[in-house]
Amino acid sequence: MNARSDLKQALLTSLVLFVPVAILMAAAPTETTNSLKPPDKDQIPVAFLISDGAVVIDFCGPWEVFQDVIIPSRQDMPFRLYTVAETKKPIRTSGGMQVVPDYTITDAPAPKVIVIPAQSDPSPAVVEWIKKSSKTTDVTMSVCTGAFVLAKTGLLTGKSATTFHGAFGRFAMNYPDVQLKRGARFVENGNLATAGGLSSGIDLALRVVERYYGRDVAKKTAYNMEYQGQGWMNPDSNQLYATALVST
């Protein structure tokens, strides 16, 4: 049995252990707003758009969330995950990790979810790929200063968004036509969503899981990850950073 099978078995076992915890959670609201309809059989394709300098937790955090989702009635993973870059050249992320992209922007499968982490400034070709792909996505989400990449497409113009608290001033200066929400863990606008810095991407990914499969599945996913953050259920939970002294 390989490591992935071992993990799946452990997660299935933990679902049983989760039941007592779920009973304790029963008092919490279970309604899901802005729900999304998952495919009956096919996997949901999730593209992680990366380039040099991509911040690891910004894309690996959401990746872990999506890969840990288990639907008891399914044999396979409900999400199909892959990386996309402008070329197949290895990407050197923050901290030096190297990632060889699965696809380029010219041959990537059409995504239903796009994850845009903090990274280097995008080329015109990458900007165009985001704009074109977002016409048919369920969710195009940025994490941290990935909001700058998403804003560069013009898709956020006239909408509200958030980003890493240390970049509030720069974002407001660069994109005055975007309503910056300081103190938001994440912000949703139709098929667009932006998360605050770093770990905020985990919460936004859990929120996407909730929109597809409901709050109980999202809770089980967080439980299996031993993730105790509650921000995915409260988009305004970054108030600590709304007026943080380190903000610029």
Question: Language-model features: where?
Answer:
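Class I SAM-dependent methyltransferase SAM-binding "motif I" and its flanking Rossmann-like core
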Residues: T163-H165
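Short linear capping/connector segments at secondary-structure termini
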Residues: A184-N189
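Extended, subdomain-level signal for the structured scaffold at the beginning of enzyme domains
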Residues: D6, P20-T140, A147-K152, T157-G158, ...
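A short glycine-threonine-serine/GTX helix/turn-capping micro-motif
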Residues: G190-G197
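Bacterial N-terminal signal peptides that target proteins for export
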Residues: N2-S14
